[in-house]
């Protein structure tokens, strides 16, 4: 890094912090001895009634005591900065928890003549920029320790503090001194009471408080919740579509069915008589029976057996002729009892069920069911 000022060196900063602590301890002890000697000299001046000289020297004692207190604060801040040197090295910007410590050291280095504090200020300026010193002076009331700002100021001490310090020195060294000419400290000055002439107060009757009678609160019933009764749902009817007109092929098929139905009505089929046991067209075949072996020893001959068979066949033929005649007569009677063919009474050509029922009853009576 090329620049006009010194570069930041953490090791050098750490060494300067340790040296600053040692130097501050030496200066603190040295200033404490000087203050003790100065107080003895001021006590001798008070014993000789040389109060003006004592008052001037007391101001020096007060500044030295302030400086000792500042040394104690700076010593603690240097130890804190030495302990958190790694935090300073790890961050590029100034940590918030270290801001007051850094600004206080930079601010005090301008007012206390310590070489180590000057080196610490240069290292911090190399780390955080050259404007650090100017920023510390501008924001001394916010970022700098307020005790350091107050005790390192160039203003003269307050007269009350001077009077208090002289009183402490005279008491410590057993000097008979009465500081009547010096003003007391501000906490000892008693304010004079202010006498105010009070005018006689006219007694007025107290205002009448009118109590309004509270009307009894009438409890109102809660609002009724009107539940809407669910109306019964009407059954939904199927959507009736208009009847489809029959096609030409359907009309022809319907006419054919009507014609077949009329033909069946004109020639009704009736139950026929059960067929005869023997068919006449078969040539009067006689049933075959198993032949029985006969011997002359039984007293029966084959001629007698054949004669018996012929007589049986003749009787069967006569019975068959009689049955055929009866069937022919029954057929003639049935033809006479057949009702006339059905003629549809409706214009549409469809059968009337009442007429069909009547015809069916007549047919049952004719067949004796």
From Swiss-Prot:
Q: Which UniProt keywords apply?
A: Coiled coil
Task: Show the segment(s) annotated as Disordered.
Answer: 224-354
InterPro entries assigned: Ist1, IST1-like
Gene3D superfamilies to which the protein is assigned, alphabetical: Vacuolar protein sorting-associated protein Ist1 (1.20.1260.60)
Bias (Polar residues) = 277-305
Tell me the disulfide pairings in this chain: none
Family, similarity comment: Belongs to the IST1 family.
> What name does the UniProt record give this protein?
IST1-like protein
């Amino acid at each position: 890094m090329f620049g006009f000022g010194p570069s930041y060196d953490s090791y050098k900063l750490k060494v300067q912090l340790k040296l600053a602590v040692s130097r501050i301890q030496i200066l603190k002890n040295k200033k404490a001895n000087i203050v003790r000697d100065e107080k003895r000299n001021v006590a001798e001046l008070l014993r000789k009634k040389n109060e003006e000289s004592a008052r001037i020297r007391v101001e020096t004692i007060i500044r030295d005591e302030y400086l000792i207190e500042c040394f104690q604060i700076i010593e603690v801040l240097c130890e804190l900065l030495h302990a958190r040197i790694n935090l300073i090295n790890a961050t590029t910007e100034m940590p918030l928890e270290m801001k007051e410590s850094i600004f206080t050291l930079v601010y005090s280095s301008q007012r206390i003549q310590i070489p180590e504090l000057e080196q610490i200020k240069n290292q911090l300026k190399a780390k955080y920029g050259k404007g650090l010193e100017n920023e510390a002076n501008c924001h001394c009331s916010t970022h700098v320790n307020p005790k350091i700002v107050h005790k390192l100021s160039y203003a003269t001490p307050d007269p009350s503090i001077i009077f208090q310090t002289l009183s402490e020195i005279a008491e410590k060294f057993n000097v008979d001194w009465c500081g009547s000419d010096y003003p007391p400290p501000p906490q000892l000055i008693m304010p004079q009471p202010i006498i105010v002439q009070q005018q006689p107060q006219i007694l007025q009757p107290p205002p009448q408080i009118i109590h309004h009678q509270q009307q009894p609160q009438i409890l109102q019933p809660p609002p009724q919740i009107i539940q809407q009764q669910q109306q019964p749902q009407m059954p939904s009817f199927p959507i009736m579509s208009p009847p489809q007109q029959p096609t030409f092929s359907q009309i022809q098929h319907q006419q054919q069915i009507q014609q077949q139905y009329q033909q069946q009505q004109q020639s009704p089929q009736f139950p026929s008589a059960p067929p005869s046991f023997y068919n006449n067209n078969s040539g009067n075949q006689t049933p075959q029976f198993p032949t029985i072996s006969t011997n002359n020893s039984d007293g029966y001959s084959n001629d007698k057996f054949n004669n018996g068979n012929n007589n049986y066949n003749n009787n069967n033929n006569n019975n068959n002729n009689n049955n055929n005649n009866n069937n022919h007569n029954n057929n003639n009677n049935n033809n006479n009892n057949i009702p006339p063919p059905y003629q549809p009474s409706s214009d549409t050509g469809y059968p009337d069920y009442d007429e069909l029922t009547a015809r069916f009853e007549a047919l049952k009576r004719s067949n004796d069911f």
